[in-house]
């Protein structure tokens, strides 16, 4: 029965080096010594996996040909050593699986705590912020309304003061006009008194003339009574009574006419003055009404202008505050995005590294399982036959090595990461 000698060697590195399997073997006939390469595997962090080889010599020969025991004394010790190492391999595999589970749990926990979806939800505060902003806006509007009411009250007080001044000026003007009219009335009264005095004097003169005329008539009568009646053809004498009556009537008519003319003139002057006073008062009132309306319009426009200016200032302040608030929020969001991007890049790089390490560990596990199966077949007495063609094929396999260079560029401002950039370069060795 032929046996073959095989030696397994693995070398794993952090630069994603493919597993290299080198086999060298030679065929021994019966009665020769066969060396079995026994492997001890232990892992190093980020330094790949190294394989140590322990060689044990087993003698075959006539024991096999004579049907003796396959494993002698030394062979039993070697198999016990193999079993111990196999148990250590299995323990190593279990520990690696546990480490892998722990790493997966840590990755999952890290994603749960640091993933962007787990950012604190501030939406519950938005309603309070909106309510407070509305209250501030309402308070500003109420403040502007109070200021406007104060201005309106001041303008109304000023309007009443101006109206009071206007009414007082009108009162003074009317009193002055009344004083002027009273002077005119006094003058007319004096003229009336003068005319009445003149009428009385004229009446006295008339009475005196009547008395004198009566006396002259009496004198003439006495003279005629003492004289002899002589009839003489002569012109008729003058009738003095008729003449006096005519004169009296003329003077009475003249006095009545003068009195009537004085009364009419007084009434005309009074009416003219009253009309002028009325017209002037109406014009003055119309002018005052126009002035009052213009002042009121001016005050209304001034109030509206002040309210618009105050509203404009309030809106400008609100706009500036809103811009500043949104600018700060935008800066905070950008900073958060930059930090999250940097964390995401770091997570990706860590995930790739852990995935690579996981693949390495999985490959080690697979190869260990293959070796365990090989040892199991050896323990069960199976032969491992490797032909010259298989050996040449394994030796002829190309070993591909790649080098991966990862560059992380971070921009830090005031101790905070603003931007982060990761570059990866893969080279064939």
Swiss-Prot record:
Domain IF rod: 75-386
Description of post-translational modifications: Hyperphosphorylation at Ser-13 occurs during the early stages of apoptosis but becomes less prominent during the later stages. Phosphorylation at Ser-13 also increases in response to stress brought on by cell injury. Proteolytically cleaved by caspases during apoptosis. Cleavage occurs at Asp-233.
Residue positions where Phosphoserine is found in the record: 13, 16, 26
Subunit record text: Heterotetramer of two type I and two type II keratins. Associates with KRT8.
Note: There are two types of cytoskeletal and microfibrillar keratin: I (acidic; 40-55 kDa) and II (neutral to basic; 56-70 kDa).
Family, per entry: Belongs to the intermediate filament family.
Protein name as annotated: Keratin, type I cytoskeletal 20
Organism: Rattus norvegicus
Lineage: Eukaryota, Metazoa, Chordata, Craniata, Vertebrata
Record gene name: Krt20
